[in-house]
Structure formats: structure tokens, C-alpha cells
Amino acid sequence: MASASKKTSACPHHGGSLPPPKLVSAAPDTVAVWSDADDQRASKVSLESVIRPVDSFPDNTAKKPANKGISVMPRTETKHPLDPLSAAEISVAVATVRAAGANPEVRDGMRFIEVASVEPDKQVVALADAYFFPPFQPSLLPRTKSGPVIPMKLPPRRARLVVYNQKSNETSVWIVALSEVHAVTRGGHHRGRVVSSQVIPDVQPPMDAAEYAECEAIVKDFPPFIEAMKRRGIEDMDLVMVDPWCVGYHSEADAPSRRLAKPLIYCRTDSDSPMENGYARPVEGIYVLVDMQNMVVIEFEDRKFVPLPPPDPLRNYTPGESRGGVDRSDVKPLQIIQPEGPSFRVRGYFVEWQKWNFRIGFTPREGLVIHSVAYVDGSRGRRPVAHRLSFVEMVVPYGDPNEPHYRKNAFDAGEDGLGKNAHSLKKGCDCLGSIKYFDAHFTNFTGGVETIENCVCLHEEDHGILWKHQDWRTGLAEVRRSRRLTVSFLCTVANYEYGFYWHFYQDGKIEAEVKLTGILSLGALQPGETRKYGTTIAPGLYAPVHQHFFIARMDMSVDCKPAEAFNQVVEVNVRVDERGENNVHNNAFYAEEKLLKSEAVAMRDCDPLSARHWIVRNTRTVNRTGQLTGYKLVPGSNCLPLARPEAKFLRRAAFLKHNLWVTRYAPDEKFPGGEFPNQNPRAGEGLATWVKQNRSLEESDVVLWYVFGITHVPRLEDWPVMPVEHIGFTLMPHGFFNCSPAVDVPPNPCELETKESEVKEVVAPKALQTGLLSKL
């Protein structure tokens, strides 16, 4: 794949008629010095000897300052405020909290659920991007008559820790200021300070993999469980798989005063085959309730004897086991070659690709986060599109009312964590081409630091034709290949795999995509039994119907600087004109817009019959036709929950009742079901409660919450491992540009030697002569 070269736009109006911004000479330039308390009380110091007005900022990697422009300011910051926490920072945060424990018993009971960076106020992010980190963008800050207030340093980075005390069954949230954290190779100078701590009553934090492993061990050692397995012909406990599931909230018995799990049981056929598909033999009829705080089985009942399904000969998916061990022999290598390397540039977590730029983040709960998305648009400069993009929750409700399937209602982000379950990706398998990987650092349950190497993949993909036109009169044609930049990660939650992707396109589109694969969650059947709530996969084995819902949170900033809040949301429906004088041919239809003025009216559902979509517009920026600039949310395939409104899981997942929610930005509103959905007894917490404030959305800082899902009626072709299912949505420019931003994409060199490059047709052998055929 050839690398793209830079060209000016072919559209004379692209970029608009506004003149490029000029930096105004600051009269009394000042420096804001941040105190330890991180307030913005500034001591003012003359900057005449340090800074002077400039037209551009040099790269901080340059050894010598440019002749024209700003002298390189002394900067001690090595990490951007939006960068994920490093391993050293996590260690400091954990050590600081542990040292702050009231007594040894409290410190010994601390278990660390999550340690993540505290994302600062948007104004702090703007300061960092303007003056501390290349490509230095002072235009991000609003101009004032007195000139910019330029800090000598940024406030300290902060960590937020969710801590579960296993001895007291309490959950607490801590904020730690990471005043100085340097690598050990630089002297090991580590320092943190507790800013705040708070015990959160009546909640349970997400479960941890260490808890799941311990739960499996204690269940397999529980004598009544061993006897129940013997009743089913299983005496080797090494064959048994115990998958702990959070109990959700169905009644007061599930209250968060206890930390509970109800495991699902499976059984392999061969303990010497670690890659055997153990999910092919579910064990039903055994009820187990585990106290995860004290790690004891508190309820057990062998309720119903259901024979184990016989081993399915098609259950395995490894090369030596699938289809008799015979793989396809006609698959030839397909290589992605970029002889000049990729077209993207990476500086830390900052990514530039053609006209796009953004920052990559990662959290234990959400996984991949995309920050500060902007498009560099000619003379109009850097134009923001979104402040923050991420997948904040997913819910998987099952449709079988029988035990144990009715309680399968997983909140995979809020109960487990998408980021904590991420994969270490492999080149050539998970991603192809010239790849940049990013590692992710987490705390484990006891406070140690673990690293998932190659957790996030950044690479370019060819995506077919971008645009083409051939003049039928002259036969002359112009065609451009489409290329997209993809940022992705994959995670495993029990039996399912999910891939989360953000695609950036040359025509200004952003596509969010989820790829679903993995293994079905199955149930066992009695001999001769069938169920209407699922699909029979093999003798004695069936897959219940279920749904997957994903919630994307999009903090939009269309043409808005960090301090601005000039966005609004309109809904567009295509209407059919009534019969009459204006529609004598009965062919008329038109697009009708409706402004979503407040949160109460901004709870919306998809409507494919009216081609419904939503546009986020800037109320103070126009394109060359005088229309407001905007980006529109275009739904893909979608659905709503098929459970009745009284379903118990909807108490915690009220946000599933609509496909779109729009709220006014509030920094503490991050998760649609509240921060702690595990065993949450409070109905409608999160989005459904926030929108009751009915805040105005007219010219504000808006956040889109898009809920999209898929209804999975399993089929035999989903067994033993599911081919990838695709689902997602698109953010598309709508009047944001003055013409197509893709017209300046250079043409690819067409292959001229077609005779050598084209695939040769297979020539069939000549038919044998009749006489020879009769002899054979």
C-alpha cells in the first residue's frame, strides 16, 4: 500500500472563507503557578524574557529553538494529563492508599479493584495541548484582551482507586495526587498524597479474576458438590469448570450487604486436553451460592438431575480437533505491505494520521478510550469533533425463563471490566500491516501491577473504493482507494469475545464497530426434550436466545474549543408529503428537523421507516452556504430489549429502554447504570435518574449515549465457535465541510502490467477420447 502524499484541496471553497487565526501579542503575559492544592490561584510573573508572540510553535524534539517563534519553555511534564497511568504511577497510588489505612487490619484487608487516571477539567487539557505538548495548539484557548494565562507547570496527575476491603465488606474511593513519579532508573523518587477518600455505602464493586479463581477452587472442594458430580458420573474434579457469575439483583436476598456469586458449571471430557471446549457440556440442576467476601459456599442444592450431554464430536475448534483434523489446503498467503511504513505518526499516546489527530487512553473498565478527536481543515486549522469516545457498558440478557438462564444478565463492563479482560494481541492474527501497539497497565487484586503487552492495536487498512466517476462521453475516469485508520482492542468475558474498533476515514467519517465472537453459553436438555427459548445445537445441548447491548458514550465538541459549549442536537426524520397540490405525482418526501431542547425530550429510538438520524451542530459556526456545521449519528442495525418492562434486570439497565439519550455534560456522569451496577438495589440509577433534571440542551456541552444491540437466535453455524458478527454506528460530517474532504486524496498508481498481475484462469483438462475412456 503506497503512502499518501500531501496535496491541497481540489475544492476552492474547502476550508471556508474565514481567514487563518493569528496569535495576538499578549500585553501583560502572565504565568499561572499551580499550588499543591491544585487551585488556580495564580502568582503573576513577567514573561517578557521568556515568551514573545509567535505564529507557530516548534516541535519539542528540536535541539535548537527556531529563529522565529517562542523560546522553548522549561517544561518538567513528561506525561500528558490524558495519558493512562504508568506502572510506576499505579504502584505509587497503591502504596499511598495502603499507607493511609487506619490500622494494620484495614491495610491487610485492602483489595484493589481499579486504579485509573483522573481526567482533569477540559480547560487543563487545553492548556496542556496549547503550551506543553506538541504540536502546540494555542488556538485551543479563547483569546482575551489581557493575553493568555500561561502556566509554568500543570497540576499534578491524579489517580482514582476503587478499593474493596475484604475484611469489612466496605467499598471506598480514593483520590491520590501523584506529585512526583519518576522511573526507578532515574532514582526511584516516588511520592503520592491522598487528596480524598470516601466509603460508598450499599454497593459492591466489580469482581476480580483472582476472586473467580478462588471461587472455582472452593466450589470444587465442597463435599456436597463433589457428591453431586459423582451422581452425574464425574469423579475427576480436574474436568470441572466453574464460571462464577454475579447474582445481579432480583430480590432483597441479592442485596449488596453480601458479596455474592452464583456459578455456572461445565465439565470437560479429557483433563489432558487444555484446549478442549469445556462449554460443550453444561452441568444443570446444581444450585450454588458463594459468599465471595469470606469465600465459602453458603447455599447448595442438587435440585434436579439432568444427564450430562454426550461428548459432541464437533465441539472443538483447534486445528487438530476440528472436522477430523483436516484444514483447508487452498488458502494462500495474503500480505499487507507498506514499503515506506505507515502514514500515521505517534508521539507517546498522541496520534496523527493525515488530517485526523487524537489521543489514545485506556481504563480497566472501558478499555480503549479516544480523547480530543479533531480534524485539521486547511485554513480553518484544527477543528474539534469529540472530546471523548468510549464504550461504557454492555448488557447481555437471556430469554430463557428457566433456571439458571433467567439470571444470565451480565453487565460485562460494570461487573467485570472490559479493559481488565483485554488480550495481548498478535501480529498477523489480530491485526495486519505496519502496526503500533500500546501496552496497558493495571493493578491486580492485591495491589501488584500487571501489564498487558500489545493491548491496543493501531494500523491502517485498505477499505475498497473511496470514490469514483467515469465520464461516459470521454471514457475518462478518476478513482481513489479508501484507507482507514483503525484503533482496537479485544477482550474475553467468560465464553464470549468482543472486539471494539474505532475507524477513522479520509472523508471525515468515524465508525464505531463491535465484533462478537467466542462460544455460545449453552444449556443441557433431558433426553427427547426441546425448548422454544433456544436452538438445539447437538443431542442434549441447546443455546438460549439472548441479546447483546452496547452503550457508547460520546462527549461531543463539534467545532467547540474546550471552554465553549455551543452544540445542540436535532433529530431528522424523512417525511412523505400528503397527497394534494404539492404532491400531484405522489412522489414527494422531505427531511424534517426537530430540535431536542431538553433531556426529557431527548430520549429517542431508532426508526428505519423514517431514516431517523441525529445531528450535533455548532450554533455559532457556519459553512459556505450559511448552514450550521455539524456531525450526524447514523444508526446501524439495532434493537430494543425484548423482555417485558417488568423484567428484573431492567431495574439496573433502565438505559436500555431507548436507543439514544442526550445529556448536558457533567464530569461525574460517566456510566449509564451508575458506577456500581453489581447487586445494585436502586432502580433506574444512572441515565434514567440524571435526565429527570431535564437540563437544557440548547447551546450546551452535549453528551450522546447511543445504545445499540443485536438479537441472537443461535444457529448450528455458530457452533463450536461463532463467526464474527458485526454491529456499530457511524459519526458522519453533515455540513461540517464546504465540500467533500476526500477530493484531495491522491490517486494510487494503477497496475499497468495487467497480464502479469491478473489471476490466470484454470484450464480444464481435455476430455479423454472415447476409446481410451472405455479401456480405463
Curated annotation (Swiss-Prot):
Keyword Membrane: no
Keyword presence, Transcription: no
Site note Microbody targeting signal, residues: 774-776
Positions annotated to bind substrate: 410-421, 493-498
Cysteines engaged in disulfide bonds, as pairs: 431-457
GO cellular component terms given for this protein: cytosol; peroxisome
Tissue specificity: Mostly expressed in flowers, and, at lower levels, in stems and leaves.
Cofactor details (free text): Binds 1 copper ion per subunit. Can also use zinc ion as cofactor.
Annotated binding of Cu cation, by residue: 546, 548, 712
Coiled coil location: none
Active site residues per record: 412, 496
Induction: Induced by salicylic acid (SA), jasmonic acid (MeJA), wounding, flagellin 22 (fgl22) and abcisic acid (ABA).
UniProt GO BP: lateral root formation; putrescine catabolic process; response to abscisic acid; response to jasmonic acid; response to molecule of bacterial origin; response to salicylic acid; response to wounding
Reactions mediated catalytically: a primary methyl amine + O2 + H2O = an aldehyde + H2O2 + NH4(+)
Involved pathway(s): Amine and polyamine degradation; putrescine degradation
The protein's Enzyme Commission number: 1.4.3.21
Main location: other
Family membership: Belongs to the copper/topaquinone oxidase family.
Function: Involved in putrescine catabolism in peroxisomes. Copper amine oxidase that can use putrescine and spermidine as substrates.
PANTHER family xref list: AMINE OXIDASE [COPPER-CONTAINING] ZETA, PEROXISOMAL (PTHR10638:SF18), COPPER AMINE OXIDASE (PTHR10638)
Protein known as: Amine oxidase [copper-containing] zeta, peroxisomal
Species of the source: Arabidopsis thaliana (Mouse-ear cress)
Record lineage: Eukaryota, Viridiplantae, Streptophyta, Embryophyta, Tracheophyta
